[in-house]
Amino acid sequence: MIRVIAICILAAIGLIAPARADMSAEAALASVAPFYKALNAEFAKDSPDLVRQATAPDWVSCRGNDLCNTRDEVIAGIGQRLKSIPDLRWEIKEVLVAGNQVTIRGEATGTPAGEFMGAPYTGKSFKLMSIDVHTLEDGKMVRSYHIEDWMGAVRQISAK
């Protein structure tokens, strides 16, 4: 009981930081938009700079709880992906904000230029959904968790 009263007193006199207010969806979108632009084939030559613009130097991108890549590794991976899918287009479909966390529902479309994730070349295109959760500090992405339906894309290009 004394602990509860002490916390209330500290909060009342301003010694406990207030909860961080949510940033606006517009501010969140402005912070992450360069990263999503970097995922588009149209901007392939600018992709590394766009990723750097949106991310902190120590940013990590995680495809699992402990499967994370550094910014430089992600930049290299995006370059490879843009070569294998030369018409890749990634669109932001929805932006949700909670504190300094930004969740993006995205959609990617493209046509692989050759064998793709073990699937033989068919000339078919795919459309997939992605969900990304980004933590922002000072307007930069510092940590991201992402999931894309690449197996759904493989099924689409492999369908008879």
Predicted regions: what they are:
Residues 110-137:
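Exposed beta-sheet edge and beta->alpha loop/turn motif
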Residues 100-112:
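A short hydrophobic beta-strand element
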Residues 26, 30, 48-99:
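A solvent-exposed, acidic/Ser-Thr-rich amphipathic alpha-helical stretch
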Residues 6-15:
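Bacterial N-terminal signal peptides
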Residues 142-160:
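Low-complexity, intrinsically disordered terminal/linker segments enriched in charged
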Residues 17-57, 159-160:
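Short, low-complexity N-terminal intrinsically disordered segments enriched in polar/charged residues
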Residues 1-4:
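Positively charged n-region of N-terminal signal peptides that target proteins for export
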Residues 95-103, 135-141:
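A short, structured loop/turn motif at beta-sheet edges
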